[in-house]
Amino acid sequence: MDDLTTRLKALSSANEFLEFFGIAYEERVVHVNRLHILKRFYQYLHRAEGLAGLDDVEMFRRYRELLAQAYQDFTTSTAVKEKVFKVFQDADGQGHVSVTSLRDSLAERRKSAGGPELRAA
C-alpha cells in the first residue's frame, strides 16, 4: 500500500482531512457540514478519472483539489440545496403535514388510549 493511502486511512474527521491537505477553512462551516463535505469528497473521488496511475505527489494534488471543491460547495450553499445524502434527495422540500391531520391523528391516539378527546378550535 502506498504512503499516501496509508496516511489517509488514519484520518477520520473533516477537520483532519482539511488540515492534512493544507486547506484553510472556517470552523463554523465545517462544524455544520462535516459529514456532507466528506461525502461530497467521496463522490468527487469516485467520479474522477485517471487517479489510479498517479504517483503520491500528483495524487495528493488531485485529492487536495477535490476536497477543496467539496468544502467550497458548502461555503456557498447549504446541505439541503446540495442534497448529498438520500434524506435530502428524497425530501426535495415537498414535505407537508397539515395541522388538521396532526389534530386528527392525536385525537385518534388519545381515543385509542382512553384519554380525553380534542375539540377543534
From Swiss-Prot:
Pfam families recorded for this chain? Answer: NifW (PF03206)
Give the protein's biological function: May protect the nitrogenase Fe-Mo protein from oxidative damage.
The answer to whether keyword Ribosomal protein applies is: no
Q: What is this protein called?
A: Nitrogenase-stabilizing/protective protein NifW
Superkingdom is: Bacteria
Q: Name one GO biological process term.
A: nitrogen fixation
What residue ranges carry the coiled-coil annotation?
Answer: none
> Looking at the keywords, is Nucleotide-binding present?
no
On assembly, the entry states:
Homotrimer; associates with NifD.
Q: Which UniProt keywords apply?
A: Nitrogen fixation
Family according to the record:
Belongs to the NifW family.
